[in-house]
Design a protein with these regions (language model features):
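N-terminal phosphate-binding or glycine-rich loops at protein starts, especially the Walker A/P-loop
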Residues: 1-51
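Short glycine-rich or small-residue beta-strand-to-loop segments that form or flank ligand, phosphate
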Residues: 3-13, 73-79, 105-111
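Gly-rich Lys/Arg/Thr-decorated short loops/hinges at beta-loop-alpha junctions or inter-strand turns
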Residues: 4-6, 67-80, 141-151
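Short, ordered loop/turn segments at secondary-structure junctions
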Residues: 9-11, 39-45, 79-80, 112-113, ...
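Short Gly/Thr/Asp-enriched flexible loops that form oxyanion-binding sites at enzyme active sites
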Residues: 19-23, 113-131
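Glycine-rich nucleotide/cofactor/substrate-binding loop typically near the N-terminus or early
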Residues: 33-102
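Short, acidic/small-residue loops that bind anionic groups at enzyme active sites
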Residues: 40, 125-153
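Conserved small/polar residues in nucleotide/adenosyl-binding loops
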Residues: 157-159
Length: 159
């Protein structure tokens, strides 16, 4: 079974931790995920291979319920933007190498505009390089009501 890695970036909010909790629950309950890891401090945590085993740290429903209602960003955050993969392929190659080294087949990144840009660039890189053993997904959230082109967004209700 492949492992799942979740990371968060951008502004902290209570909804961002609730998302992490949902990812942990879904990973555990799916029966298709080996371990659920969290990258500390966003994509920088991925690049630095700074992971925590979330299904061990949050091994009870009570711990996950507390995380879900805890404000801030439990995994930490960053404001790092990935460059253009055509100009800086090394950064993308390193991310793929690290994900494969840790047997990660699912990467979920939650955050705002820059985070979704990271998801987009990494997804396109995987597609263009026929990387089909890693699925990259975004969980959009905003505290600024500035995230367009999505019908669902964490942290803020769009009216």
């Amino acid at each position: 079974m492949k492992n799942l890695l979740v990371a968060q970036s951008g502004g902290p909010s209570a909804a961002i931790n609730a998302t992490i909790t949902g990812v942990i629950d879904a990973g555990i309950e799916s029966g298709r995920v080996g371990h659920v890891y969290g990258a500390l401090n966003g994509i920088k945590g991925v690049l630095n291979e700074n992971f925590v085993n979330l299904d061990e740290v949050c091994d009870t429903k009570e711990k996950r319920d507390l995380l879900a209602i805890t404000p801030a960003a439990a995994l930490g955050s960053c404001r790092w933007k990935l460059g253009d993969p055509k100009e800086n392929a090394e950064e993308f190659e390193e991310i793929i190498r690290i994900l494969r080294k840790n047997d990660i087949g699912y990467f979920i990144y939650t955050g705002g505009n820059d985070s979704m840009d990271t998801v987009y660039k990494l997804s396109v890189y995987c597609e263009e390089h026929n990387i089909d053993d890693i699925k990259v997904m975004g969980a959009p959230k905003t505290i600024d009501n500035d995230l367009g082109e999505t019908d669902h967004c964490l942290s803020l209700i769009h009216i």
